[in-house]
Amino acid sequence: MGLSTVYSPAGPRLVPAPLGRCRSAQPRRPRRAPLATVRCSVDATKQAQDGVATAVATEAPASRKECFGVFCTTYDLKAEDKTKSWRKLVNVAVSGAAGMISNHLLFKLASGEVFGQDQPIALKLLGSERSFQALEGVAMELEDSLYPLLREVSIGIDPYVVFQDVDWALLIGAKPRGPGMERAALLDINGQIFADQGKALNAVASRNDEVLVVGNPCNTNALICLKNAPNIPAKNFHALTRLDENRAKCQLALKAGVFYDKVSNVTIWGNHSTTQVPDFLNAKIDGRPVKEVIKDTKWLEEEFTLTVQKRGGVLIQKWGRSSAASTAVSIVDAIRSLVTPTPEGDWFSTGVYTTGNPYGIAEDIVFSMPCRSKGDGDYELASDVLMDDFLWERIKKSEAELLAEKKCVAHLTGEGNAFCDLPEDTMLPGEV
């Protein structure tokens, strides 16, 4: 099968598709055409006035070869619920879209669980030449799921095409660490991927694009990506540490004998590695400081931290695979924390750019810190944070690791020659 082909709803065979052209010319590099597009057209004016869509007509596959089955349908927005108000279509790109994490995530995105039940969505799926057939299979499953909010699905292997006009980029795809691979080598290999994707986002994505980096090592990959995308505010880049936060909440709830909805103000400081700092000093259980509820200081300082750090490895030992489903849930949580207002007094953890932070953490790295949002996609760092010597000492250890990683990838961030001196291996279990 050629790479410029699309699935035809008329039958199981593949039909040739003409090469497409991108609106934003990129003379410095050759372009591939989008490999396939699944699109549901919506009239924006009618959308604002009339409400929910009803399928009334389907174009012939020959006239719209980019269509994928039912997504060739045109919706008549005058036909149904007059009180329903659709928001503007949100374009979401997902890299590593044929992987296990994405397999859980994409259906949550399409269902409205993430952005809301009045938010139409377009999914733009980035893969590789090797994963292209799997991407077609993903698109077929999305088609069969009949999500009314899912208006477009496109698949491709060129980030300059897939990232066109995206509002959110969820960068999951990264090379796993192979047997005998040095951590410095993994930083370089994955760093190249995120440098290229940063350049593509810089060239063609929305200027207000929100970027969530999941592929590991995610903090430094996020730094590389933002350094290669100066057209997008550095504040818009995030490294996923929400799964670590969720794991910490679970352990505190178990120890206190409460359900986890009673646990708040949990922070993961630092790197997504075994130097991460689950913060129990500021955490609360049912509105009370954790140290007032859990009086076992030795457990908090030792077992709690180690349990959170090693949770992924234990899961692999039990199940034989890494935590794809819970990672997808944590991505949903991370996005929702930015698009819905933070509950009063609470905060959430996300890896963000440190320049200008109020805590004294080194600038110009991506570091997980406590944040609050008004629900507009923006955030502010929490100011009402307690700090003691025990917490600060561990924060500085994670900071030192990220500064060392930054030196390893200086050639990818425009800061000269790389120098790599990583004295210990702190990759989280399951990521080696």
Swiss-Prot record:
Sorted UniProt keywords = Chloroplast, Disulfide bond, NADP, Oxidoreductase, Plastid, Transit peptide
Task: Using the UniProt annotation, give all residue ranges assigned to the region (Disordered).
Answer: 18-37
Q: Where this protein primarily resides, as one coarse class? A: plastid
Q: Name one GO cellular component term.
A: chloroplast
Residues annotated as transmembrane: none
Tell me which positions the record assigns to the signal sequence.
none
The family database entries (InterPro entries) matched by this protein are listed as: Lactate/malate_DH_C, Lactate/malate_DH_N, Lactate_DH/Glyco_Ohase_4_C, Malate_DH_AS, Malate_DH_NADP-dep_pln, Malate_DH_type2, NAD(P)-bd_dom_sf
Q: How is its activity regulated?
A: Chloroplast NADP-MDH is activated upon illumination. In order to be enzymatically active, disulfide bridges on the protein must be reduced by thioredoxin which receives electrons from ferredoxin and the electron transport system of photosynthesis.
A GO molecular function assigned to this protein is: L-malate dehydrogenase (NADP+) activity
Q: Per its record, how is this protein called by name?
A: Malate dehydrogenase [NADP], chloroplastic
Instruction: Tell me what organism the protein belongs to.
Output: Zea mays (Maize)
